[in-house]
Every structure is written in structure tokens, then in C-alpha cells.
């Protein structure tokens, strides 16, 4: 069972490979487009696609609210590729099963890496994390195995939650 923050082509890819995928999208236009793809590919039974408007002053973060409703230890993977990445990544750590995967796309914009990235807008070790929430996330996942991938334009990281963690 997986959770995807930010729907798109990856929604179809993951839906074909997992038992059930919940996906949250903030763009109404993009939500409709992905919903059409899901119907055309006959994946409706395997995908629950949610629309969550962006947060406004005085209105709680809808992405974060959706993540908080998920039972702890219930997800095999989380893909973070949408808005509020820092808050969502941090909140998702407890939602993963032991050995679960937390995948963050475009991570070079938010977290530095030991071996510097050549991706544009990459964070240096000197600059550190992009926010206090990212710093907290980095500390929380420091003991997790990490697999970094880059195509020179963007970086993606897979964090593997420790067994028993």
C-alpha cells in the first residue's frame, strides 16, 4: 500500500505495481487529467485520487491533514513529489512500515548531500537544509539507509526505514 503526494505519470506507474495507491493532488486541472488516465487504464479499483486545495491563512494544510489520518506503520512506501514536501516528508516517517520506502523527488532543492550534486539549485553542505522542518527530517532519518540518484538535472532519494524502526 502506498501514498503519493503529487499525482502524475508516477500514479499510473505505481498503481500497476502495488495493491493500492492513495494519491493527493492540489491542482484541480491536473487532478482531472490524472483521473482520466486512471479511468482509461482501468485502474480505478487500485487508486484513490484525492483533491486537496492549497492551504490558505487560517485553513490547515490539506496535504498534511490527509497524511495525519493514515494509521502509523501502514504504508509500504510514500512518494513525496508535491507541495509542502518538508511537512509531508516529516509526517510520513511514522506512517511507514519497518523497511518501508520514503521517496523524495527533486530532493536537491531541500537537502544537501555528502557528495555534492550537479543539479541546478542544489543545496550545498554549507547552505544546509532548506527549512527547519527539513533539518528535523534530516536528523530523524540520519540512521536510515539512503539511495541517491541523479540525472544531472534533478536528484531523487529513497530513504529506507530501519527494520524495527
Segments and roles (model prediction):
Residues 1-56:
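SAM cofactor-binding core of SAM-dependent methyltransferases
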Residues 67-77:
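A short acidic, Gly/Pro-enriched loop at the edge of an enzyme's catalytic core
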Residues 77, 83-165:
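C-terminal substrate-binding/active-site "lid" region of AdoMet-derived donor-dependent transferases
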Residues 53-69:
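Surface-exposed interaction regions that form or flank ligand-binding interfaces
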Amino acid at each position: 500500500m502506498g501514498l503519493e503526494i503529487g499525482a502524475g505519470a508516477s500514479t499510473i506507474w505505481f498503481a500497476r505495481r502495488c495493491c493500492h495507491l492513495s494519491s493527493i493532488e492540489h491542482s484541480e486541472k491536473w487532478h482531472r487529467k490524472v483521473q482520466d488516465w486512471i479511468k482509461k487504464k482501468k485502474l480505478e479499483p487500485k487508486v484513490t485520487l484525492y483533491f486537496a486545495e492549497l492551504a490558505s491563512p487560517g485553513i490547515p494544510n490539506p496535504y498534511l491533514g490527509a497524511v495525519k489520518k493514515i494509521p502509523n506503520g501502514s504504508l509500504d512506501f510514500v512518494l513525496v513529489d508535491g507541495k509542502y514536501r518538508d511537512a509531508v516528508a516529516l509526517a510520513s516517517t511514522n506512517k511507514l512500515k519497518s523497511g518501508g520506502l520514503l521517496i523524495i523527488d527533486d530532493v536537491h532543492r531541500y537537502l544537501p548531500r555528502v557528495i555534492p550534486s550537479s543539479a541546478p539549485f542544489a543545496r550545498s553542505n554549507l547552505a544546509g537544509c532548506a527549512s527547519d522542518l527539513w533539518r528535523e527530517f534530516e536528523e530523524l532519518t540520519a540512521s536510515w539507509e539512503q539511495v541517491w540518484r541523479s540525472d544531472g538535472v534533478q536528484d531523487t532519494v529513497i530513504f529506507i526505514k530501519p527494520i524495527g524502526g
